[in-house]
């Protein structure tokens, strides 16, 4: 039976970069747990802002946090008051100096994490799961996605037995490394229990960065 590889982890170093960009030998475990705490705090504090991903860069006792959000206005607040409050709270979680940067997500409809969270929110509001899934598929294709797959698992519609349902439109080639596939996961906390929502979105094809930098191979022949 075939198993699913995480689409983003599978493409790291080929067409995708890491969300944590730093190198450390002695304090690796400390920094890793610190990154987890920073991400969890931002997600909890800015739950309504539509957070797609959080990038963390470290260099010379400085931590730069890039928050990719669909609603930058909620993060920044009136005259930048919101961002200063969050920055102050984040400073208490780390010994290093914190720099907070807000990056706007232009097309939230083709961002897998935001689509998954949107479906989860609709399920919590008791909207029919088939309707929520089909609407997300149609919207993503309308905004330029080449293909999309949406899957929900759990006690769908309040049924006694948990099941797995999915819809797919267009191309979603999970084994093609040059395929720019975005993946997102969210959980809907309903009265019947948790429902998992997974989304795969194919946004096009990207040539691997290493392919362009690689020197052309020469065949053996007479010496010049």
UniProtKB/Swiss-Prot annotation:
Show the PROSITE patterns listed in the entry: KH_TYPE_2, RIBOSOMAL_S3
Q: Could you tell me which cysteines form disulfide bridges?
A: none
Which residues does the UniProt record annotate as the domain KH type-2?
Answer: 38-106
Give GO MF terms, alphabetically.
mRNA binding; rRNA binding; structural constituent of ribosome
Q: Name one GO cellular component term.
A: cytosolic small ribosomal subunit
Q: Does the keyword Ribosomal protein apply?
A: yes
- Keyword terms of this UniProt record: Ribonucleoprotein, Ribosomal protein, RNA-binding, rRNA-binding
Write out the GO biological process terms: translation
Instruction: Describe the protein's quaternary organization and the partners it interacts with.
Output: Part of the 30S ribosomal subunit. Forms a tight complex with proteins S10 and S14.
Q: What is this protein called?
A: Small ribosomal subunit protein uS3
Its source organism is Anaeromyxobacter dehalogenans (strain 2CP-C)
């Amino acid at each position: 039976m075939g198993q699913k590889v995480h689409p983003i982890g599978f493409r790291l170093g080929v067409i995708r970069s890491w969300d944590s960009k730093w190198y450390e030998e002695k304090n690796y475990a400390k920094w890793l747990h610190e990154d987890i705490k920073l991400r969890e705090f931002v997600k909890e504090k800015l739950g309504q802002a539509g957070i797609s991903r959080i990038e963390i860069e470290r260099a010379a006792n400085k931590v730069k946090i890039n928050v990719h959000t669909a609603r930058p206005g909620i993060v920044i607040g009136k005259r930048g008051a919101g961002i200063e409050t969050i920055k102050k709270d984040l400073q208490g979680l780390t010994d290093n100096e914190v720099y907070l940067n807000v990056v706007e997500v232009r097309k939230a409809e083709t961002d897998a994490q935001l689509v998954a969270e949107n479906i989860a929110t609709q399920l919590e509001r008791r909207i029919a799961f088939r309707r929520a899934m089909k609407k997300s598929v149609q919207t993503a294709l309308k905004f330029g996605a080449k293909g999309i797959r949406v899957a929900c698992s759990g006690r769908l519609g309040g049924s006694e037995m948990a099941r797995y349902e999915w819809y797919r439109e267009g191309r979603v080639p999970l084994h093609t490394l040059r395929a720019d596939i975005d993946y997102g996961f969210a959980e809907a906390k309903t009265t019947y229990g948790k429902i998992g929502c997974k989304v795969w979105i194919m946004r096009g094809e990207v040539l691997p960065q290493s392919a362009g930098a690689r020197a052309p191979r020469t065949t053996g022949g007479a010496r010049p």
